[in-house]
Amino acid sequence: MQRSIKKVAVLGSGVMGSRIACHFAGIGVEVLLLDMLSPGAEQSKLPKERNKLVDNSLQAAIKSNPSPLYLQKFASSITTGNFTDDMNKIANVDWIIEVVVERLDIKKLIYDQVEQYRKPGTLVSSNTSGIPIHLMAEGRSEDFQKHFCGTHFFNPPRYLRLLEVIPTATTDPAIVDFHMHYGDVFLGKTTVLCKDTPAFIANRVGVFSMMSVLHIMEKLALSIDEIEAITGPLMGRPKSATFRTADVVGIDTLVKVAAGVAANCPNDEAKNIFTLPAWLEKMVANNWLGDKTGQGFRSEEHTSEL
């Protein structure tokens, strides 16, 4: 199949969406980055006001360390907008990547809009961390389902090489082959073909590991520093160890993936490992989600309150 990617639409400008946009811009692809209309800007006619949410997210990504861009000038390849005013522009892109919040109902609402404006043959994929791909494809047009799959990037996408490609039973095999090839040759990824099982491969293993550590921590009354000292380079793992990794990934993402596995794998022999400690749920309730909110595991001032 001869297919080229000249322009990509990224739907959702959070930590992952903004950085995926930067990664594509870094390889010379034009990017349309869309998110919700900025709160309180419903009556404004000024794009600057209506796009404040997405613009602020992109600027935060550009200023982050390590940088998501090879060179700062590549940011000029990213055009921002919002779902209300600019969703029609996805008719002019070659690939639509959905990166909105990890809730199936919200993702389906976004796909309703995508179906209104997407031209036939355009690739569509989800960056979900663990929601079953086939649930997002249900009820969609035949052409949508044929060109739809999961493409799961990892944070930060410029530096983490893994890209999981997750087709459904209705995904055209040629589309799967294209994603595997494009991810390898153009995005610089190690592409891994996954079955559409809860949390796929990396998060099924990684979140199991993290949740196991949390339960052991409770049982043995270990501190965050003790866990970090044990589960980092001492074990042959990155220095981000357990809790710094959780802060980067997003504690809300960790919770949603763990809860999703517990709900969708009732017969899994390790199901109890994915049970959430009460203090972890309290962190999410307090909006202590890691780097994205500026408060997570690595702030002793607040984690001591748990």
Where does each model-flagged region fall?
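N-terminal glycine-rich phosphate-binding loop for ADP-containing cofactors
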Residues: 1-304
